[in-house]
Amino acid sequence: MSRQDRIEMDERMDLKQKSDVSQEDRSRADMYNFLGLVLARPADEILLEQMSQLSGDQSELGKAVETLKRVSKVSKPNSVKIEFNKLFIGVGRGELLPYASYYLTGFLNEKPLAALRRDMVNLGLSRANNVYEPEDNIASLMEMMAALIVGRFGSPVSLGKQLKFFDKHIRPWAGHFFTDLEAAESSILYASVGSVGRLFMEIEVEAFRMSAEKSA
């Protein structure tokens, strides 16, 4: 099989996986991907431009998206980089430590990280070669949820498996983290990111609850 044939086969498989995912789930995955992207590194000029084109509805989440849009329009890449560094890097450590282990145990690289790594192996997830952060950081977990929903590393996983991963690795602490991000002293643009993240987590919790009740 030629390289071109393999590429075309991969593209057909990718299209099939996308067709197996509902529009609602694609929207969920898009939000998880967005949060992962904006929390992984400082928003650059391109991302800020994209964020300034966002649009929200009259829901609480939609209003938070509109606020993020307005803040993005007046934000500059250099100021966002400074804000990001104060929040997550700092001198010695940033204002926030966005890791499941820290939020759940008070320490880094603890049992929550070990449990996540085991589940990643079972689900066929792996850390990118150019990522050196512990896998239980909030950006990576957002990206993992998106990958599970759309089947980026295979077939889309069932809602039950999504719920299990969410309940174990995200629900216990992500809402708390996003609330802290909203209120952090250094947060300007990222305060709006925190609002979007917190409200989205609340929606996911409720949606998973309703789904579990229907299947009970």
Language-model regions: role of each:
Residues 2-216:
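Surface/interface-facing alpha-helical segments and adjacent flexible terminal/loop regions used
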